[in-house]
Amino acid sequence: MSNIPAELRYAQSHEWARLEADGSVTVGISDHAQEALGDVVFIELPELGKTLAAGQEAGVVESVKAASDIYSPIGGEVIAINEALADTPEDVNNDPYVSWFFKLKPSNPAELDKLLDAAGYQAAVDAEG
């Protein structure tokens, strides 16, 4: 069973989003996503300063099994990327909720409310079978 922290919000496409005290939003992939991918070997992150729309492709995660697109769960400007993942992409497998991908300055913070809570995300994962 996947770990699904209650304090996060989730996209159907398996990204998580965390609202920070400064109003920024940190984004990563869920435990379920990293389990499905297997051993992560490469991560392509968005460029700093890029403006993303909710649901827009933001990067790619490559594992020994497959390559999977990463989507921005909300719209906003990329204000930070986790450069450590370039050297140690496997950190995502070890702790997907510490190994964030990028941070956004949200264009509309209310978009967070449209994401799934932990129970909703668990139901979506269960529905996938």
Swiss-Prot record:
Keywords, alphabetical: Lipoyl
Gene Ontology terms: cellular component: cytosol; glycine cleavage complex
PROSITE patterns the record matches: BIOTINYL_LIPOYL, LIPOYL
Domain called Lipoyl-binding: residue spans: 24-105
Lineage: superkingdom: Bacteria
PTM annotation (N6-lipoyllysine): residues: 65
Entries under Gene3D superfamilies matching the protein: 2.40.50.100
Single GO BP term: glycine decarboxylation via glycine cleavage system
Family annotation (InterPro entries): 2-oxoA_DH_lipoyl-BS (IPR003016), Biotin_lipoyl (IPR000089), GCV_H (IPR002930), GCV_H/Fam206 (IPR033753), GCV_H_sub (IPR017453), Single_hybrid_motif (IPR011053)
Function: The glycine cleavage system catalyzes the degradation of glycine. The H protein shuttles the methylamine group of glycine from the P protein to the T protein.
Entry protein name: Glycine cleavage system H protein 2
Origin species: Pseudomonas aeruginosa (strain ATCC 15692 / DSM 22644 / CIP 104116 / JCM 14847 / LMG 12228 / 1C / PRS 101 / PAO1)
Lineage of the species this protein comes from: Bacteria, Pseudomonadati, Pseudomonadota, Gammaproteobacteria, Pseudomonadales
